[in-house]
Amino acid sequence: MAEATLARRRPSRRPAWAGFAFSSPWIIGLVVFMAGPILVSLYYSFTEFNLFQSPRWVGLKNYATLLEDPKFLGSVFNTAYLAIIGVPLGLAFALLVALALNFPVRGQPLYRAIVYLPAIVPVVTASYLWRWVFNAQYGYLNQVLGRVGLPQPNWLADPLWTKPAVLIIIWWGIGATAVIYLAALKQVPQQLYEAAAVDGANGWQRFWYVTWPALTPVTLFQLIMGVIAALQIFAPTYLLTQSRGNGANGGPGDSLLTYTMHLFHNAFVFLKMGQAAAMAWILFLVIGLLTLLILLTSRRWVHYGSE
């Protein structure tokens, strides 16, 4: 009798096996198409491999060679420049746009749609459009600058102006970030603003002590995603520096040679798959460490509703 009772209480393993069976296609796909290639790329990063010959083990040579490569160091600087300047200012611009869209004015839905529209334009289309806008001879931007008496820089041929041109393209697509900020603004209780007004808080104080703390969780998410995207930027710089029949060359003085573009050149132009794999793993570790650092420091400035 006791054995029969224990048998009835013993949990069945059929539901667990059924779950594994239903998820097995996804697990197999993950192992075959993601986990497997990732581990293979780690092996390739310690080899000399050009796709036509068998990989030859060279140890840490690829990593040491990269540290001595001026183009590698230049690509690190260019990418860091775009990330350090582009991400914080992009978040600031998006927040200002969201604050402006949060005011109850006539035609508000139309303004929101206009702001968000550039974010859904394909990056290839937007990059070619901006390439025409930045043209030094007949570009629309220089025509406007000339009419108001301002200098007309050679945006895509002068190393001093190539990075600002890319930053403009990046900031052009802040509509998605602004919409997320706008959604967060809608969640701030109006009672907090009313209480702050009763206490005599001015507009800046209401923003700093009421609005900003409520936006810090969203800012944390946007900061992490922005850093990851900036460190992997490829399409705008590649398309802006692309010349007819010669591919992309990194721009004047390699001023737009970003990390991922240099990785692409090593892999598919020079067929240095070992160095490309090493660069990919360096980028992976840098993104992971920066994400961890942001999460650890977020405890000091991110405020949640329950705190």
Predicted regions: what is each one?
Residues 1-14:
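Short, Lys/Arg-rich, polar N-terminal cytosolic tail immediately upstream
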Residues 15-307:
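A structural signal for multi-pass alpha-helical bundles of membrane permease subunits
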